[in-house]
């Protein structure tokens, strides 16, 4: 028996006779795991053998009881060196297992605990009746039994259930006999009742026919039974049961249709005790419609049987009856005009702290009849735009505010400083110990002080104080002071007077003096004694300013650092002396390093400008009163995030003062300085602070309840007294007192969601406070912070009396709301930046290019299109957007890069003419590059100008150029041309940073910002939070409940970010604070760009947003141009070799079998994925227009699958005629004869997936018009299936880039492969890639098998794509070389004849910096050894070893020290 185990046995007083048994001879504690949050200790024991059952139970009971006394939960398991599988011992432990969770569930225990077990053939055999030998018990309970028996010491057992026929027959016989007896008795009872009834009835004159069975009556009775049935809480269901009735809310619904046409509704419900999975079957569409009430958010009553789902292995209700019910909702029952206004409410934009969306918060207030509601998120205003729009819609006033983190600009080292020599005057070093942090609710229990002169103690003071009550365990644990120390101690007032006499005429010194002085002054005030007036030095702030590089400035860390003795930290006498020793060191360093000799110098010469970073944060609520205040609010939020961010956004008090116009201030919650002063310094101090604010906040006692657990307030009566004190503060400071709710969620049952979110932050988070210290620390409870009605708030404050409660809850909050003016948070118009002569420049550039291409005068069709577009662009102030985009594209072009367009900008011919996009939206046409003669095909017979046959100009004989994709302008700026243009551009990823800087250069640093985003908790992340909460707090949730909790916790703000390419430009005649605050992304104060504080979507119709995205295509094109010298603009879009790729592999010189695919699409942008390759195989495109169709079909939602694909397969339509891109609908319908406006409207309805959502009357109007113009029914039906459509201009830009890349694959293959591997490939495996065809194909086969088994990793999936291209390259006769230490580039692949040489970065684990360092080092000289490669090249030992294994290093020695014997050989 180990000493540690023996000690444990002593502590639990294990009987000696049991300890002396052979099983205990080598007993030991293998491990103890301590979970401090959940206060759970896990013991892992080792024994010589499985314990006798009586010994085990004794050990178990004594461990539990002993640790329970210390509020600690215990579990333990046993590893036995020898296992006895005798029947008696095994049976005893088998039955014992059912006394331990989770084996003790009622259903499992009742069905299994009395069964017999045996051990045969290395298996535990359970003989069970047939009716319990089922999947439910096998899957859900037997694994728990295995774990429990393992914990007993039996190791991991294999359990097998066998059906005991004899037992089954016996139980069945008993059941049948019992049932027959019951039936017999029931029949007898019925006969006797019938006889009695007949005796009472009059004689029957003639026989009447027997009544027919009434099915309707039976159904009615069944329905009546359903209506009156007892509702079972979901938490109580643990096993299969019949005819169970639930009531709850549906939170998830999925409808499926089987191959046989039956429908399944899988849904999940919660009654907030737990959640459940349910299933309802419907035989056909008609029956399915009867259950439309099964919808997300609906409240239902359901009845059905609980069964184990064979697929999910979880309990599921098979629903038999369902009925929609009305949920009892909380309502504000106060009369109109007597309802409160909530002035402190958080939305899900309060980072990791609150749940409701601002819309749900406002909707609830409006539903309750409140006239206004305030939004006060923590340190941000990101919910303002949505709140602004929702409040206007709901007809309620939104009060825009925030809960700010206020700090003092400079935290003083000295209070009340005077002209004194720090090195010559006497100092009184003091410290106090208290029963808590509240001077009003806790007591002084020790005051100690030491008088020091020049570092020497000359006199000491040390007195304990009797608080009049026993000390709490927490106080004793923290201070080391026990009730024994306080026996015979003097009364408080006596000690206070003596201490004042002791400290007279001394400089007072304390560590964290603000607390000590505040506590002392509160006690002096209470006993009518004079407050502290002499100078005070705070050594905490002294250390922070003198040693800012230190991370911790507490007394303990400082004494360790300076080797000052501190034997009993948190006992006042020891702390006071240690503080004195530290002060002497501080004074010496301050004099030597900063020349500080006088007390007055501490605050003036030593306090750092950034001392606000260490200042204690105090909360305050700030509200926008008017439009001036809104702009000031935006400035404050910006400054707090940009200039004063330290852990959290901070607002120094002087900064707040400078921007206070138009703002109103409240004292906030228990973390506000007025509340803190009431607790720690007294009412007088609180009144002085309260004068700074516009009103005093008080909150429901339930909000302050956690302060009782934290021992800051004694009890409920103490909370009520604090609230009365705050009201008194307001009265004396002449400030109104308002009751606010500190709302963090809407409904009481949503508390658990916030609990999960907050606990996920870990113990280090400020909001996730703990009680206690060290391993015994427990999470402090969170307040009940739901949105309260007026009635609920009045009930909370009933202790104040009816009139005063009404005043603070209703009257004062209404009065405050009346002081708030309506403000415009989001502008109603677009404000574009000003560029001198933008309108003239756009028009001039347009006509200049148009004349160059089409001649002067212009063809009518061109002239009319330009006039139409310029009227819209110039008339709506969009010229500057066009010109800015043109300038950016032109700069990138000058740096040698093409820029691809995205979205619908290619629908604008003006954009084409000024060089923003290559896509020409005019109808297909010819134009002569010499004489500008042109021909336009306007009847819709040609889909793309690139598909026109080649022909010469009839006027001059020069070969015509071909262009035009037939895209209407309306798809870009709307039918009326007034939609704000969204110009998205694809810059090369290499050039994107330069393009971003171009925006700054054009518009100015102070006007260009990255488009901000808000990152919220995703449901998958929330799922992890729920599982973590289960683990840490000993919870067990069924799967449906986990899903419900995860959904409830999702959507909360977690961080901020930036759009990958979006840049917002503020007009130079305004400033950014007219639109939004600004910040750094993800609170990274080192970021080179500031972002908009608002999500850019919230202001994208008010300011210019440029989408400057990075893309591989322009980078790839630039690489190919550099390799070949070919200008990509000259590459024809109708090259026959390129088009041949879409129909076979012959043009590549390989067979489909060699490369594993029937076409040459591998590695071609837009067309290389498995999905699109499959579409190509089915449709066989031969023209550019058909490629546009494919691009549209592959990017749309429900456009190809279940729609166009079926139409083509069935021969109803062709690739050319199906609906592919959104613009095709408008063009097709206009060609069919519909009015342009209706054609446009139909296109908009279809492309947004609204066709089936609009009214039947509107839809039928469109259908009638289409049929009148001979639009086929299949086309109309296809419209109804579409959810989203791709713009044709986007497709055209992408396809054009793709064909340019494909051109090189066909005609300059080695260059293509070099560019592909340098830019597009995501994963490499050089050993395989340079190992030849067999190695490549073998690895591909390996990954294919893994994919089939769903075992392939993401890296392997990316590698497979790379290997497909490697395989193709090798099959075409090219070679993949090995990494070469002296030839390989750092980043780019190199071409050596018909061979590609990989770069260093392609080696797994070798990053860009090391790759560049190796190249630089080899230029300085040859690597003579592996050691030198590591040293000069920066390669790790692992990388060098990997290079050696691949044969890259040849015979390179380990080091370049020659052996003594090398000279002889």
Swiss-Prot record:
<dbReference type="InterPro" id="IPR028112">
    <property type="entry name" value="DNA_PolC-type_N_I"/>
</dbReference>
<dbReference type="InterPro" id="IPR016195">
    <property type="entry name" value="Pol/histidinol_Pase-like"/>
</dbReference>
<keyword id="KW-0269">Exonuclease</keyword>
<dbReference type="Pfam" id="PF00929">
    <property type="entry name" value="RNase_T"/>
</dbReference>
<protein>
    <recommendedName>
        <fullName>DNA polymerase III PolC-type</fullName>
        <ecNumber>2.7.7.7</ecNumber>
    </recommendedName>
</protein>
<dbReference type="InterPro" id="IPR013520">
    <property type="entry name" value="Exonuclease_RNaseT/DNA_pol3"/>
</dbReference>
<keyword id="KW-0235">DNA replication</keyword>
<dbReference type="GO" id="GO:0005737">
    <property type="term" value="C:cytoplasm"/>
</dbReference>
<keyword id="KW-0963">Cytoplasm</keyword>
<dbReference type="Pfam" id="PF17657">
    <property type="entry name" value="DNA_pol3_finger"/>
</dbReference>
<dbReference type="InterPro" id="IPR029460">
    <property type="entry name" value="DNAPol_HHH"/>
</dbReference>
<keyword id="KW-0548">Nucleotidyltransferase</keyword>
<dbReference type="GO" id="GO:0008408">
    <property type="term" value="F:3'-5' exonuclease activity"/>
</dbReference>
<dbReference type="GO" id="GO:0003677">
    <property type="term" value="F:DNA binding"/>
</dbReference>
<dbReference type="InterPro" id="IPR006054">
    <property type="entry name" value="DnaQ"/>
</dbReference>
<dbReference type="InterPro" id="IPR044923">
    <property type="entry name" value="PolC_middle_finger_sf"/>
</dbReference>
<keyword id="KW-0808">Transferase</keyword>
<dbReference type="GO" id="GO:0003887">
    <property type="term" value="F:DNA-directed DNA polymerase activity"/>
</dbReference>
<dbReference type="GO" id="GO:0006261">
    <property type="term" value="P:DNA-templated DNA replication"/>
</dbReference>
<comment type="similarity">
    <text>Belongs to the DNA polymerase type-C family. PolC subfamily.</text>
</comment>
<keyword id="KW-0239">DNA-directed DNA polymerase</keyword>
<keyword id="KW-0378">Hydrolase</keyword>
<dbReference type="InterPro" id="IPR004013">
    <property type="entry name" value="PHP_dom"/>
</dbReference>
<dbReference type="Pfam" id="PF02811">
    <property type="entry name" value="PHP"/>
</dbReference>
<dbReference type="InterPro" id="IPR040982">
    <property type="entry name" value="DNA_pol3_finger"/>
</dbReference>
<dbReference type="InterPro" id="IPR036397">
    <property type="entry name" value="RNaseH_sf"/>
</dbReference>
<dbReference type="InterPro" id="IPR012340">
    <property type="entry name" value="NA-bd_OB-fold"/>
</dbReference>
<dbReference type="Pfam" id="PF07733">
    <property type="entry name" value="DNA_pol3_alpha"/>
</dbReference>
<dbReference type="InterPro" id="IPR024754">
    <property type="entry name" value="DNA_PolC-like_N_II"/>
</dbReference>
<dbReference type="Pfam" id="PF14579">
    <property type="entry name" value="HHH_6"/>
</dbReference>
<keyword id="KW-0540">Nuclease</keyword>
<dbReference type="InterPro" id="IPR012337">
    <property type="entry name" value="RNaseH-like_sf"/>
</dbReference>
<dbReference type="Pfam" id="PF14480">
    <property type="entry name" value="DNA_pol3_a_NI"/>
</dbReference>
<dbReference type="InterPro" id="IPR004805">
    <property type="entry name" value="DnaE2/DnaE/PolC"/>
</dbReference>
<dbReference type="InterPro" id="IPR003141">
    <property type="entry name" value="Pol/His_phosphatase_N"/>
</dbReference>
<dbReference type="InterPro" id="IPR006308">
    <property type="entry name" value="Pol_III_a_PolC-type_gram_pos"/>
</dbReference>
<dbReference type="InterPro" id="IPR011708">
    <property type="entry name" value="DNA_pol3_alpha_NTPase_dom"/>
</dbReference>
<comment type="function">
    <text>Required for replicative DNA synthesis. This DNA polymerase also exhibits 3' to 5' exonuclease activity.</text>
</comment>
<dbReference type="Pfam" id="PF11490">
    <property type="entry name" value="DNA_pol3_a_NII"/>
</dbReference>
<feature type="domain" description="Exonuclease">
    <location>
        <begin position="431"/>
        <end position="583"/>
    </location>
</feature>
């Amino acid at each position: 028996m180990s000493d540690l185990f023996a000690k444990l046995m002593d502590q639990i007083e294990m009987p000696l006779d049991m300890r002396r048994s052979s099983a205990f001879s080598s007993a030991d504690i293998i491990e103890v795991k301590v979970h401090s949050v959940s206060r759970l200790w896990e013991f892992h024991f080792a024994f010589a053998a499985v314990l006798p059952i009586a010994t085990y139970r004794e050990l178990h009971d004594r461990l539990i009881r002993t640790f329970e006394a210390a509020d600690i939960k215990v579990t333990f398991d046993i590893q036995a060196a020898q296992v006895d599988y005798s029947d008696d011992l095994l049976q005893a432990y088998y039955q014992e297992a059912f006394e331990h969770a989770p084996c003790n569930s009622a259903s499992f225990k009742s069905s299994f605990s009395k069964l017999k077990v045996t051990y045969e053939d290395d298996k535990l055999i359970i003989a069970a009746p047939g009716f319990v030998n089922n999947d439910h018990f096998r899957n859900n309970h037997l694994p728990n039994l295995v774990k429990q028996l393992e914990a007993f010491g039996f190791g991991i057992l294999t359990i097998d259930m066998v059906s005991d026929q004899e037992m089954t027959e016996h139980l069945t016989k008993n059941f049948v006999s019992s049932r027959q007896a019951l039936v017999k008795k029931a029949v007898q009872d019925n006969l006797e009742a019938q006889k009695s009834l007949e005796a009472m009835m009059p004689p029957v004159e003639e026989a009447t026919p027997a009544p027919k069975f009434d099915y309707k009556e039976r159904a009615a009775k069944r329905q009546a039974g359903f209506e009156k049935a007892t509702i079972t809480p979901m938490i109580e269901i643990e096993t299969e049961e019949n005819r169970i009735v639930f009531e709850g809310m549906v939170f998830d619904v999925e409808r499926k249709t089987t191959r046989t046409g039956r429908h399944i509704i899988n849904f999940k419900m919660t009654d907030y005790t737990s959640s459940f999975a349910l299933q309802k079957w419907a035989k056909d569409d008609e029956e399915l419609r009867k259950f439309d009430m099964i919808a997300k958010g609906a409240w239902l009553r359901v009845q059905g049987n609980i069964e184990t789902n064979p697929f999910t292995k979880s309990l599921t209700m098979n629903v038999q009856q369902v009925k929609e019910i009305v949920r009892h909702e909380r309502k504000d029952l106060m009369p109109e005009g007597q309802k409160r206004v909530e002035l402190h409410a958080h939305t899900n934009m309060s980072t990791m702290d609150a749940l409701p969306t601002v819309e749900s918060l406002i909707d609830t207030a409006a539903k309750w009849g409140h006239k206004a509601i305030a939004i006060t998120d923590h340190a941000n205003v990101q919910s303002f735009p949505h709140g602004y729009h929702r409040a206007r819609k709901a007809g309620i006033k939104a009060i825009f505010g925030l809960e700010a983190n206020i700090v003092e600009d400079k935290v003083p080292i000295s209070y009340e400083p005077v002209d004194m020599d720090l090195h010559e005057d006497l100092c009184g070093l003091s410290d106090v110990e208290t029963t808590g942090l509240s001077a009003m609710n806790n007591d002084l229990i020790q005051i100690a002080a030491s008088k020091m002169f020049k570092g020497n103690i000359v006199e000491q003071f040390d007195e304990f104080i009797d608080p009049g009550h026993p000390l709490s365990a927490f106080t004793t644990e923290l201070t080391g002071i026990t009730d024994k120390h306080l026996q015979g101690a003097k009364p408080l007032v006596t000690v206070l007077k003596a201490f004042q006499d002791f400290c007279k005429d001394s400089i007072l010194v304390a560590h964290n003096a603000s607390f000590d002085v505040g506590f002392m002054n509160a006690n002096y005030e209470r006993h009518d004694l004079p407050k502290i007036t002499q100078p005070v030095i705070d050594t905490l702030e002294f250390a922070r300013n003198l040693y800012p590089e230190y991370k911790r400035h507490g007394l303990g860390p400082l004494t360790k650092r300076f080797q000052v003795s501190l034997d009993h930290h948190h006992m006042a006498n020891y702390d006071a002396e240690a503080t004195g020793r530290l002060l002497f060191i501080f004074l010496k360093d301050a004099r030597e390093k900063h020349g500080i000799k006088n007390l007055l110098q501490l605050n003036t010469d030593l306090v750092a400008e950034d001392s606000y970073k260490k200042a204690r944060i105090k909360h305050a609520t700030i509200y926008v009163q008017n439009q001036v205040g809104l702009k000031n609010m935006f400035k404050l939020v910006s400054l707090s995030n940009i200039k004063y961010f330290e852990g959290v956004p901070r607002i120094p008090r002087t900064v707040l003062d400078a921007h206070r116009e138009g703002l109103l201030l409240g004292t906030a919650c228990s973390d506000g300085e007025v509340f803190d002063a009431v607790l720690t310094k007294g009412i007088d101090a609180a009144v002085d602070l309260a004068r700074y604010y516009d009103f005093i906040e008080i909150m429901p006692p339930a909000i302050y309840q956690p302060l009782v657990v934290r021992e800051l307030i004694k009890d409920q009566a103490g909370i009520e007294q604090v609230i009365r004190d705050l009201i008194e503060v307001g009265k004396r400071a002449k400030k109104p007192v308002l009751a606010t709710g500190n709302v963090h969620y809407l409904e009481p049952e949503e508390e658990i969601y916030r609990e999960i979110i907050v606990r996920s932050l870990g113990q280090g988070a400020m909001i996730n406070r703990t009680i206690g210290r060290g391993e015994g620390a427990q999470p402090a409870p969170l307040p009940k912070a739901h949105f309260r009605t007026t009635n609920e708030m009045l009930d909370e404050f009933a202790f104040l009396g009816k009139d005063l409660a009404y005043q603070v809850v209703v009257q004062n909050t209404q009065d405050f709301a009346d002081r708030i003016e309506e403000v415009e948070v989001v502008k109603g118009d677009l404000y574009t930046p000003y560029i001198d002569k933008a309108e003239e420049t756009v028009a001039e550039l347009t006509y200049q290019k148009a004349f160059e291409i089409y001649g002067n005068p212009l063809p009518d069709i061109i002239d009319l299109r330009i006039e139409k577009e310029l009227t819209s662009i110039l008339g709506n102030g969009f010229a500057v957007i066009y010109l800015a985009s043109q300038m950016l594209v032109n700069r990138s072009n000058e740096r040698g890069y093409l820029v691809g367009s995205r979205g619908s900008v290619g629908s604008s011919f003006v954009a084409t003419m000024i060089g923003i996009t290559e896509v020409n939206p005019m109808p297909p046409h010819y134009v002569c590059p010499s004489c500008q003669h042109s021909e336009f095909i306007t009847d819709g017979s040609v889909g793309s100008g690139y598909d026109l046959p080649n022909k010469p100009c009839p006027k001059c004989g020069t070969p015509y150029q071909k262009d035009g994709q037939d895209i209407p302008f309306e798809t870009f700026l709307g039918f009326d041309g007034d939609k704000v243009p969204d110009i998205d551009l694809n810059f090369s990823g290499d050039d994107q940073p330069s393009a971003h800087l171009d925006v700054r250069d054009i518009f100015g640093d102070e006007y260009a910002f990255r488009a901000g985003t808000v990152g919220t908790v995703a449901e998958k992340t929330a799922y992890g939070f729920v599982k973590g909460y289960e683990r840490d707090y000993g919870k067990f949730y069924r799967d449906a409940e986990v899903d419900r909790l995860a959904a409830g916790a999702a959507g909360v703000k977690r961080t901020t970010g930036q759009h990958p390419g979006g840049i917002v430009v503020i007009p130079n005649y305004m400033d950014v604070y007219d639109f939004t605050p600004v910040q750094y992304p993800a609170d990274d104060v080192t970021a080179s760009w500031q972002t908009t504080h608002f999500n850019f979507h919230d202001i994208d119709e008010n300011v210019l947003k440029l989408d400057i995205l990075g893309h591989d295509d322009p980078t790839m094109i630039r690489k190919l141009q550099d390799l070949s010298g070919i200008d990509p603009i000259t590459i024809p879009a109708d090259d026959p070799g390129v088009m041949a790729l879409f129909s076979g592999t012959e043009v590549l010189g390989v067979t489909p079998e060699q490369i594993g695919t029937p076409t040459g699409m591998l590695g071609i942008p837009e067309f290389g994925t498995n999905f699109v390759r499959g579409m190509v195989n089915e449709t066989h495109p031969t023209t550019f227009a058909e490629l546009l169709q494919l691009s549209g079909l592959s990017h749309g939602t429900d456009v190809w699958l279940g729609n166009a694909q079926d139409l083509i397969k069935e021969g109803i339509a062709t690739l050319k005629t199906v609906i592919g891109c959104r613009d095709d609908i408008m063009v097709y319908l206009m060609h069919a004869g519909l009015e342009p406006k209706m054609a446009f409207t139909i296109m908009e309805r279809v492309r947004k997936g609204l066709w089936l959502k609009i009214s039947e009357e509107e839809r039928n109007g469109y259908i009638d018009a289409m049929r009148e113009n001979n639009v086929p029914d299949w086309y109309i039906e296809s419209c109804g299936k579409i959810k989203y459509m791709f713009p044709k201009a986007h497709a055209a830009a992408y396809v054009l880039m793709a064909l340019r890349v494909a051109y090189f694959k066909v005609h300059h293959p080695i260059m293509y492969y070099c560019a592909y591997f340098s830019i597009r490939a995501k994963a490499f495996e050089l050993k395989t890639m340079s190992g030849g065809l067999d190695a490549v194909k073998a690895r591909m086969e390996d990954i294919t098998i893994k994919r089939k088994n769903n075992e392939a990793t993401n890296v392997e999936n990316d590698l497979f794509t790379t290997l497909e291209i490697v395989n193709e390259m090798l099959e075409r006769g090219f070679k993949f070389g090995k990494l070469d230490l002296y030839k390989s580039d750092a980043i780019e692949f190199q071409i050596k004849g018909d061979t590609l040489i990989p770069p260093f970065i392609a080696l797994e684990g070798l990053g860009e910096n090391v790759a560049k360092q190796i190249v630089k080092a080899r230029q300085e000289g040859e690597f003579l050894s592996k050691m030198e490669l590591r040293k000069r090249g920066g390669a790790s030992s692992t990388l060098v070893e990997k290079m050696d294994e691949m044969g890259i290093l040849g015979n390179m020695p380990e080091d370049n020290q020659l052996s003594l014997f090398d000279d002889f050989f």
